[in-house]
């Protein structure tokens, strides 16, 4: 019997959520991208206004991730709140090429902590665009997590690379399975 996991990808507009889903989805990605209008247009031509959706069967064939990419713009926060409901896992993408990526990531972490996210959801932090801006590094992001009272895996990610995206999703899957097994055996 196939077990499904709802996983959402969150992060600012342009952080690679749509690209990551497209790089690994086994189905044609359902997308609600529209032509960007406001300040986003300087960074990219389109922006997600609803959500992106793709599917990935975890190697072994018994588990599937249903991947949802959330809009990154503040005005679409309500969509992120809706998509977070019932999520088993979250992949938070931190854009290292922003002027103050740590402050921006702190803001996302606080939004996740105060939103409708289930308390037992597994989170993983993927740092994108390290090829453009190598700092802050992983250790600085780990320090930020500790300051926020959080502890979860942190890794670099090139959202264009199916291998890297799959690697991070496998790490997330292992965390989900471990949590599920602890639940069963406790």
Which ranges hold each PLM region?
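Conserved G1/Walker A P-loop phosphate-binding module
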Residues: 1-45, 56-57, 61
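Short glycine-/polar-rich loops that comprise or flank the Walker A/P-loop
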Residues: 4-5, 86-89, 119-122, 150-153
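Conserved beta-strand segments of the P-loop GTPase G domain that flank and frequently precede/overlap
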Residues: 67-69, 91-96, 124-129, 156-158
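Inter-motif core of Ras-like GTPase G domains
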Residues: 76-99, 114-116
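Conserved C-terminal guanine-recognition region of P-loop GTPase G domains, centered on the G4
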Residues: 96-150
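Canonical P-loop GTPase G-domain recognition
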Residues: 132-186
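Conserved catalytic network of the ASCE P-loop NTPase/AAA+ motor domain
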Residues: 48, 57-61, 82-86, 114-119
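Switch II (G3) loop of P-loop NTPases
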Residues: 60-77
């Amino acid at each position: 019997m196939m077990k499904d996991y709802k996983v959402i990808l969150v992060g600012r507009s342009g952080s690679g959520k749509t690209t990551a889903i497209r790089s690994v989805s086994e189905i044609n990605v359902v997308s609600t991208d529209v032509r960007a209008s406001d300040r986003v247009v300087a960074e990219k031509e389109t922006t997600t206004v609803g959500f992106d959706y793709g599917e990935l069967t975890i190697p072994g064939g018994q588990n599937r991730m249903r991947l949802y990419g959330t809009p990154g713009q503040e005005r679409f926060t309500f969509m992120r709140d809706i998509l977070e409901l019932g999520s088993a896992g979250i992949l938070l993408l931190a854009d290292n090429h922003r002027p103050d990526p740590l402050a921006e990531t702190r803001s996302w972490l606080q939004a996740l902590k105060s939103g409708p996210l289930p308390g037992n959801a597994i989170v993983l932090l993927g740092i994108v665009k390290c090829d453009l801006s190598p700092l802050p590094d992983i250790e600085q992001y780990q320090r930020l997590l500790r300051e926020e009272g959080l502890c979860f895996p942190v890794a670099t990610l090139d959202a264009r690379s199916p291998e890297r995206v799959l690697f991070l999703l496998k790490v997330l899957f292992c965390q989900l399975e471990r949590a599920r097994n602890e639940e069963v055996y406790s």
